[in-house]
Structure formats: C-alpha cells, structure tokens
C-alpha cells in the first residue's frame, strides 16, 4: 500500500451540480461539506508521550460509548507495530534519526488509518479511537488530511502529565507486562522505557490552542484530570466525550454492587412492584452489615433506589445512605406485579417478543433495557467520580451497571447473572476491572431466566415497535443507502416507493453500501 493511494484527492466535483459558495473550509478543489454532516463518523486521535494514560483513556472511553449505544472501536498503533516488527530490541527503534524505523512507523499508521476507514464504511462504525503518540504536527496533519478526504470528523485528546510519580506508577503497572518486554526484570524495563520517552520528547509538539491548532477540536487533559482545556467542540458526541473525560479519575477505589435482600414478591415469582423484604431478605441485610464492618472500608458511600426493598436493606446497615429514583427497577408497565407464567398467558405476543430481542423490547407502558441504560447514564458519571461505594439496586439495574464495568454488549447484558444475596466487588485496574463475587451464605430464590435457545427465522421477526407509542424503531426490510454522500456530490434525493422496491429486490446493488445508524 502506497501513501499516494491512501490519501488520494478527488480531482473534481460532480459537474452536474454546482453548489453556491460557502464559508466552509475547503482542501484544494475538494468539496468538504460532507465532513460537517451531523452524522459523519468521528475519529478520536490520542496525543501524548508514552506512559501518559492514552491507552487507559482509549479503552475506558470506548467502553462507555459502546455502552450508551455508539459503535466504537480502538485502533492501537502499538499492535500494528508489533505485527510489522516481531521482535523489539530497545529504545533505539524510537529515535527520530532512525530512518528505517521511522518509515516502518509511518507505514503502520497508514495501515491503521485504512482499517479505520474500513470500519466506518463497511462495518457501520460511528467512532474510532486512534491510540498512538501522534506527538508531531506532521503526523497530526497527515491524519487531518486523511479525515478530510474521507469526510470524517476529528477530535483530539491530548494527555499531558509532568508528575514523575504518576509516570513511574504507570510504567510499573502497565509497561512491565507489555509484549515489548517479555521476560525482563523491572529495572531494565524502567530504564529502557524512560529512554524511549526521551526519544519522543525530542520531537514532541504539543497542541497549540492559541495559534497553529486554534481551529481544531480537542481537549487537553492535564495531570490525570487536574485541569482541562477544551477547544471548539463540534457536536453532541464530542460534548459527551468531554463530559465523560472530565468525570473519570485514577485514584484507587472499590465499587460494591448488590441487589436488595430477597423480597416477598421474589418468593411469589412476581416482577416489579414495591414489596418489602422476606425473612431471608432481612437475614441478608444483617449479614451485609457484618461484612462491611469486617472490611473496614474508609469513607464508604451507600446508594439505594427509592423502592422499599432496597431501603430496608440499607436501613439495617446503620449508616447514612442516599436514595436515587433512577436506580429503581426496570418499569414492566402493564406486566408489573405479575409472574412470567401470568404474562405468557395474558400477553402471549408480548412474552414472545421479549424473548426475541430482550435488550430492545419495551414493556407496554414500561421500559426496555435500552431505556434503562439511558436512564442510568448519570449514575455511571457519578460512579466514575466517587471513591469507595456500595450500590444496592435491582436485577435489571445491576445488569446494566455490570455491563458497563465489564464491557459487555447489548446481546449479553439482559442475561448477565446477578443472583440475590451475592456481592460483586469491582476494583478498577489499568485497562479494565477486576471482579470478585462474595457469597454471604444466606439462601434466596433464583430469579434468573436463561436466554431462549430457539432461533426465530428473520422472515418471522416483526417490526420493532415503541410499545407505548407504536412508533417503529426500525424495519426488517431496511433500504440500504451509502453511509456518507461522496465528497462533492449532491445529496441523494428521497426514493420513490417504486424505486425503493427496485432497490430491495435488485441483485446488482453495490455491496459496500450500509444503512445509516441513528445515534
């Protein structure tokens, strides 16, 4: 793959359509209005010296965006480099005067960007995170040129850190176990990696918000969230990214998640409602109090929902707690306080629909798991800001929270096993979350329903509906359209019904066209 073929510039715009002059930025004769379309994919470009937490931010941000339903993927340049150079020798590979290595590193960047393009155009990706140092203006300009040619938005995230303790801790926690350093002792790894950082410092050009980079969209994160500098945020997604990055921290803490004690409705097999604790539920609450006292957790906060069963569980702890309405259990609408057998008898169609696509299914007059994720987003933001915390919630709520911390997709989320009287201890680590389950030896009923094993033919899959408004969410016969209009061309006109039918039935349609996802 050559550089010229990767970043070719279109020679002319569509001759049959001449748009009026506008004040939009243009690159040569290329019409660039498409890069400002609201639904254009966004390329997040990380910037910073090694050991500044770029990969930590990349993975965490990707996990959050996927959780809220925005298809996102990380492209780590280190992975591409290790594919190209199988054996890492020393920091000499990163010297700016090592011409052969510089060519390899640039070629790896080009290959990664081509994969970004394929992800956007062929896999319906919405956001790609380009995880690399990108410390020179030359490299960043190359990325900007690539994005303009393909009508992608660009948002830079620069991580700046001058705290030697933070840098050293990052090297020891993450880099010692890096594939670059197999079977090496810590002292040698630290020495080599510090020299690698010095190689990057020679050519490092930070973002310049006052002059050279004043027109770019970016956020500078200084000393792991001590200060922030935000410049020219373009859209809703970028504002959400900024808000998220301003809430996360890296201080050690533990998050405890558990459901309320067994309730009277749990014993009857009923869903929803606002029943109190059973005898065994009260036993669990006392066992939970004893467990927390033994742990001697400093400055522990306790959150509950506003439903009776979580409040009664927290009351037994003898500590201050906060009630959150948004932690209430999923709203089952007309099915509240019914057993699954009763739902199947009274609403057989609804029962079958929920089994087909549990994440998207919305109870009539109630909520779906997708709705619940949106409702819980403020909880995630606050959890990211907190220290040690215990959240006493409900089965569906706990599934959503666990899916965020464990990076589980929409298919897995509604079927995560969250038993009664089990505590999940989550400890954030470098690139993920360590999970421990703690049993307090108090019996309880099993409220888990496994995923149905039967498969429905696509021809039998109904149109998904908003159950309380009967507004279609999507059609099983989606008309496929190009992800983005080609640069310089007239936006496609709406299809007539006959033409739409032709497109659905025709066998000669382009294979690379994809439907436009709604975010």
Curated annotation (Swiss-Prot):
Phosphorylation results in the activation of the kinase activity. The modification N-acetylserine is found at residue 2. The active site is at residues 131, 161, 260, 329. The record marks 259, 266, 394 as: Transition state stabilizer. SUPFAM superfamilies: P-loop containing nucleoside triphosphate hydrolases, Phosphoglycerate mutase-like. It holds the Pfam family 6PF2K. The lineage of its organism: Eukaryota, Metazoa, Chordata, Craniata, Vertebrata. Beta-D-fructose 2,6-bisphosphate binds at residues 259, 266, 272, 340, 354, 358, 369, 395, 399. The modification Phosphothreonine is found at residues 471, 478. GO terms for biological process: fructose 2,6-bisphosphate metabolic process; fructose metabolic process; glycolytic process. Residues 252-519 are annotated as: Fructose-2,6-bisphosphatase. This is 6-phosphofructo-2-kinase/fructose-2,6-bisphosphatase 2. The gene is Pfkfb2. Beta-D-fructose 6-phosphate binds at residues 81, 105, 133, 139, 175, 196, 200.
